[in-house]
Amino acid sequence: MKQYDAKKILNIALAGHSGAGKTSVAESMIYLAGLSDRIGKIADGNTVLDYDPEEIKRKVSVITAVAPIEWKNTKINIIDTPGLFDFEGGVREGMRAADSALIVVSGKNGVDVGTEKAVKLADKMGLTKMFFVNGLCDESARFYRVFETLKSTFGPAVCPVIVPYIQDGKANVYVNLFEYKAYKYENGKMSQTDMPDMGDRLEGLRVAIKEAVAETSEELLDKFIMGEEFTPEEIILGVSQGVKDGSILPVFCGDAQNTFGINQLLDSLTWLAPSAADKGSEFGVDTNGDPVEISVNENGAAAAIVFKTVADPFVGKLSYFKVISGKISTDTPLINMRTGNQERITKVLTVRGKKQEDASYVGAGDIGAIPKLQNTITGDTLCAPTRKVVLDGITYPNPTYTMAIYPKTKGEEEKVAAGLAKLAEEDPTIKFGMNTETHEMIISGMGEQHLDVIVSKLKNKYNVDVVLKEPKIAYRETIRKKVSVQGRHKKQSGGHGQFGDVWIEFEPCDCDDLEFAERVVGGAVPKGFFPAVEKGLRDAIQKGPLAGYPVVGLKATLYDGSYHPVDSSEMSFKMAAAIAYKNGMPQANPTLLEPIGSLKAMVPDNNMGDIMGEVTKRRGRVLGMNPGEDGMQVVEAEVPMAEMHDFSTYIRQVTQGRGSFTFEFTRYEDAPANIAQKIIENAKNEGNV
């Protein structure tokens, strides 16, 4: 593929709800561009872009993939993103590399939650937005109903460009409203045909265009209000400018699996979609933390953002990047601004799906890949040593679904950790680590399906079988009553014996773990043994009397005892303290504490009742409600951590994916008696007490 100037490069992310046909649209584009001899089908597992074994097995996109094509002297970098909410991290990666988002909408299902989320994310990332209504050959598809929903959901900026003429249930004629020409698809080919009689509907669509164009400037708005007609040049210029500045959201349509409407879509993109150069510049910070502007200029100092990483044990590591300024080749010196180290570029590639081709260089505005950058991760900035700058990285959603992960074969814990570390290089929404208290390896992701894919990849890529279990809860124990007890340790076994004798007062306090004090008089216990008594208690409180959980909020005061001048030792008094603890705790009204977390659930207004009811069902307390962003409501509550395990699944289901939440530990409080009893019984059955 030849080199293109940034003015002739389009970086377009395909986004939208799962099942809308994003990958099919991309495959149709690849086919029409002459880069494939057939249109890949997801059901057959033979697409260019869904090449990952997990995608082939599940018949759904789970990673972001890139495919450059050439169309009418323009290079289009197609960035196909996942639609499932569990893989939102991939959508953010794809949009970071894009300059516009083509949001694919099902002609049958219409505007889904994934449509809304894609629009919001594109807005947040400053991308131009366009719509493609797909699947119109399905008899259940209803383009005009979907168009009206787009308009009512996203406002008057929604503007029709290509619309179908449906006759006898067939959607194989498409009208370009700008050209005022009709095209028919027959036997795999597109040809111009007579304009169909669409009656008042066509006039209504042209009015929709005028309304959208009128919003692009005050002059055109005045003209529209006065009832004057726009010239064809004004319409084309207004739409082109409006699309690029975001004041117009163009709508295309067709059926990707049959290539219907895809030619017209590609033709329109070459003049409607913003080029890499249209963006003008990106902002970053220099080494002093001061903001700097980096122009999209091939003659500038090199600067690129790494937006995706593939870490495959068989193929090796591959870092996908977008060049903002300059050129990147094997001769380009590059600094990784996160590590401060220079990276050695052995090869520069262009990638189409899993196919790699050597490139002499990748210029400003374009996308490429570099193999074997071992210390580079997604979000890193690579730049010339002569102009050090850090570009905006990628903000990932916080994982909300957590499980404990165990190897099926004992002793393979390190193998699991190594595999997860590699997978986390590819997918930063994976978080994992060892819970030192419960002695479990914990993994967090975006949902059940996300973790299911991780388990499958561990087996297929890193040859380690694992099982997921509900994570253990880190309970605590405390006391509610003041007691005084003796701890006496005496042992005689020939020679020097062991002797330690202490009287300790145990009482509740506000401390985090143990507060140790002494008020011994008359040398009943020598001062030199005080540290041993404290050490014995600190070791002992790691296991409470009820269920073996650590004890907190305990004050222990050593106030009396006795010693033997020969047999007493630090170990003797350490043992005596442990005996006092063991004797005293059951008498001090021990209580089980459970961790409580602070919940903030962002949900649509009509789901507030569902969420509040669910909080109550999970033994939580609703603290209040506040208006949030984008018309959402924020429900604030406190909920026991033990009740939150599957809350991410619940909130996604009840809000159809619109809701989100944050949850973090706040404090411990008494567990209800019935709950405490179950926990204590389980601990006894597991041998923890």
Pin down the residues of each PLM region.
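Structural and coupling elements of P-loop NTPases
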Residues: M1-V689
